């Protein structure tokens, strides 16, 4: 397996806002439509995959984010490394669905504080009015012209997923913009 190097983002605390890199975490893209897919995924992850658009579901270990009618992003701490193998062996190998490790494609940035949604609104066309009141909501949008996935985990706290190649540019924009809100 490749030895992944994560961007060197220093934790930043500003007035009512905290920014930090939330890595390493495992990120798996799962796809499927068959009944067996949902049964196996639910049993292995001990979670029901969300079927409503722009929602997520969570338990003590795993977070599952709805991306499309047959696609989810599941993320969790690296300690559960054998989960990928279980999912792959019981779903992909049996042609019930697709399991792809995308950990090295996405970087997770955690943003929390009272000004979280002010910061996001300053660089996104998405209207966060309803989003910020619904925990476990998910959106795929643009932030400073960069594709992101945003998971609302707690009140005034989000996990923002950005492609690795855009992560440093977006991090610099976030730090700079946070000073002016």
Give the ranges of each region predicted by the language model.
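Basic, glycine/lysine-rich polyanion-binding surfaces/domains
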Residues: 1-181
């Amino acid at each position: 397996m490749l030895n992944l190097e994560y961007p060197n983002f220093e934790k930043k605390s500003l007035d009512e806002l905290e920014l930090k890199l939330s890595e390493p975490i495992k990120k798996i893209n799962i796809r499927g439509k068959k009944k067996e897919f949902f049964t196996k995924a639910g049993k292995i992850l001990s979670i029901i995959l969300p079927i409503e658009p722009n929602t997520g579901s969570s338990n003590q270990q795993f977070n599952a984010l709805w991306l499309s009618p047959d696609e989810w992003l599941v993320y969790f701490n690296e300690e559960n490394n054998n989960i990928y193998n279980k999912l792959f062996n019981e779903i992909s190998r049996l042609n019930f669905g697709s399991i792809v490790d995308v950990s090295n494609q996405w970087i997770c940035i955690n943003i929390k504080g009272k000004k979280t949604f002010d910061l996001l609104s300053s660089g996104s066309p998405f209207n966060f009015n309803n989003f910020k009141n619904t925990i476990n909501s998910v959106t795929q949008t643009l932030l400073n012209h960069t594709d992101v996935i945003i998971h609302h985990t707690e009140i005034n706290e989000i996990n923002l997923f950005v492609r690795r190649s855009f992560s440093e540019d977006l991090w610099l924009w976030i730090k700079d913009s946070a000073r002016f809100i």
